[in-house]
């Protein structure tokens, strides 16, 4: 593993919890960009999406960030070292392996978290989320893990039908899903690391085991949320930014 410019084996306990940002994936569904650069460096409004994620946390009082890198990680290290961060914001990169799954990446960061609670999220998702409310919800329920859940917009509009005769009653343009999905923006107690192995996919066995044991709670986020999975998503997020009405821009 390799830290970026500011050295130190541990992130000490000062104020808000540290934030782990998962930056290691290959981003294959966004290959128009990711053949040349890692997905976290795909730009929105001229700045990498991971910069937007860090800003979202930093403007709400978080200061310590660990970027778990993998694919083309050297580019992320260079970005972190060369970016002028807000005062008191400390951004470090840790090489967690080329193809290490999400849970394994967090497991590898365990020694650097100094046995304290921490937040975690993905490098490709932005939201108009109040992180102080998320943190208060997490500390209030006294369980090991909190996962933010969202109801994304459906890809297509829907047609409303009369079930009796098939008569079309109306149309709705891209309504929100009726189902809640994982939106990232996690809060974890250090005990979560005991649920992780180096080959763990966070979203599968670890979260499922936490749920079965009653140790996972969901924080519902009803407002804007979007992840950048495809080229179309990247275009949509850039359009929002250029409109001056990007809902995640809280700074």
Predicted regions and their residues:
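Conserved N-terminal catalytic core of the sugar/cofactor nucleotidyltransferase
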Residues: 2-22, 29, 43, 47-122, ...
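Short alpha-helical oligomerization interface
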Residues: 35-40
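Residue-level signal for inorganic ion chemistry
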Residues: 50, 76, 109, 124, ...
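Conserved beta-strand termini and adjacent loop/short-helix elements that scaffold enzyme active sites
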Residues: 70, 94-96, 148, 219-221, ...
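Short beta-strand-to-loop element that shapes/binds the nucleotide-sugar donor at the catalytic cleft/hinge
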Residues: 71, 146-163
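Catalytic-core segments of class I nucleotidyltransferases/pyrophosphorylases
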Residues: 117-119, 126, 132-139, 151-154, ...
């Amino acid at each position: 593993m390799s830290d970026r410019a500011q050295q130190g084996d541990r992130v000490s306990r000062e104020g808000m919890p540290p934030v782990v940002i998962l930056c290691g994936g290959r981003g294959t569904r966004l290959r128009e960009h990711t053949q040349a650069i890692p997905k976290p460096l795909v730009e929105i409004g001229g700045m990498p999406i991971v910069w937007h994620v860090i800003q979202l946390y930093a403007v709400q009082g978080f200061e310590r960030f660990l970027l778990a890198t993998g694919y083309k990680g050297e580019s992320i290290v260079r970005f972190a070292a060369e970016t002028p961060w807000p005062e008191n914001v400390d951004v470090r990169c840790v090489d967690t392996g080329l193809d290490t799954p999400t849970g394994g990446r967090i497991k590898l960061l365990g020694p650097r978290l100094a046995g304290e609670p921490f937040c975690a999220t993905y490098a490709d998702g932005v939201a108009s989320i109040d992180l102080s409310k998320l943190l208060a919800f997490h500390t209030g329920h006294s369980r090991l893990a909190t996962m933010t859940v969202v109801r994304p917009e459906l890809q297509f509009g829907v047609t409303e039908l009369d079930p009796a005769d098939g008569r079309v009653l109306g149309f709705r343009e891209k309504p929100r899903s009726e189902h809640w999905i994982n939106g990232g923006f996690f809060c974890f107690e250090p005990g979560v690391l005991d649920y992780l192995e180096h080959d763990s996919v966070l979203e599968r066995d670890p979260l499922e085991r936490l749920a079965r044991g009653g140790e996972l709670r969901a924080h519902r986020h009803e407002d804007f949320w979007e992840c950048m999975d495809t080229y179309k998503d990247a275009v949509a997020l850039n359009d929002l930014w250029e409109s001056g009405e990007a809902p995640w821009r809280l700074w």
